[in-house]
Amino acid sequence: MSSGDRPVVLPANQPKQFYRGGASIAALRGDESADFGPEDWVASTTTLYGRDDAGLSTLPDGTLLRDAVAADPTAWLGERHVAEFGADTALLVKLLDAGQRLPVHCHPSNEFASTHLNCRHGKTESWIVVGTSGDEPTVYIGFREDVSPELLEGWVAAQDNDDMLAALNPVRVAAGDTVFVPAGLPHAIGEGVFIVELQQPTDFSVTLEWKGFLANADIGHLGLGYDAALGCVDHNGWAKTLDTLIRRTAGDTAEVVPLFSEQADPFFQADRLQVSGSLTLEASFAVLVVLEGEGKLGDVPLRKGSTVVVPHGAGEEVLNGELVAIRCRPPRLAG
């Protein structure tokens, strides 16, 4: 079984999805001939909703990462993390390439998940835009104005897709932008947007706009029925406060660029590392996604498209080379 004392390069891990995409993931990984899907779950200890194994990452020796962490959580995650979360990475990282617009949907909060789904984690997420295609790459975030429960129920019952999408705030995005998506916030990612996504480690989604995307409505409400599932939706208007969710970081040339504001700290952390020479990284469980260039993490070779899981037990590591990478980490611990 893989030990938690050195970084491990991971292959692609692509559980089947209902929507199109994947060309940008294939291009990043340098394997454009492969039949890539729209999502690549990196260092995943999370399964697809309702599935036993689909979605789990496998280490090079054939061990599931989930099992390796469970066997030695302190080595993989660190003593302080284990004291708070046990043998739970508390993080899921994805590469997501939207080859079509995704449906309007949202995710439950910790409180809703605990009450209705018997799970500690809901699904707050953040998007790091790393590439776009097309003339108007757009994401849709939160209702423009307050929407009553009755109006939303009517849209969902009638599958009034046009009105649901029109009710959201459209935001043009470019590489370097980040978007924080709190649990409950209705949203959709537009065609041509390629992101590194950090999220809580669940696959809980309430699909408001299921027609044309899912086989039937039953798949969209987490087995709760829409009457209960819609209780997780944020009905508030966000037009006046949308800027609190968005950061534009493309022009920041610092060696380490924090990508999220403090509101993300209880859920995850991410930095863009822009290395020309060497950079020392403190000990932490982390997921590294290399966007450009090449180099080494310790003695582990890296190139564009490399995805790496770094155990806390690897200790302080030096990143050498000429490269740009996203470093993803679990929630910031208090104290």
Task: Map each language-model feature to its residues.
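Short, basic/aromatic beta-hairpin or loop at an interaction surface
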Residues: S148-N161, L281-V289
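Loop-centered beta-sheet repeat module
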Residues: V156-T207
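Short acidic-glycine-tyrosine-enriched beta hairpin
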Residues: L168-F180, L297-E316
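His/acidic/aromatic-lined binding-pocket segments of jelly-roll/cupin-type domains
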Residues: V93, L102, C119, E125-I128, ...
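C-terminal amphipathic alpha-helical segment
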Residues: V206-S278, E282
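Ligand-binding loop in jelly-roll beta-barrel domains
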Residues: D97-R101, T132-D135, L185-F204, P301-R303, ...
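Transition-metal
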Residues: M1-V147, K211-K240, A270
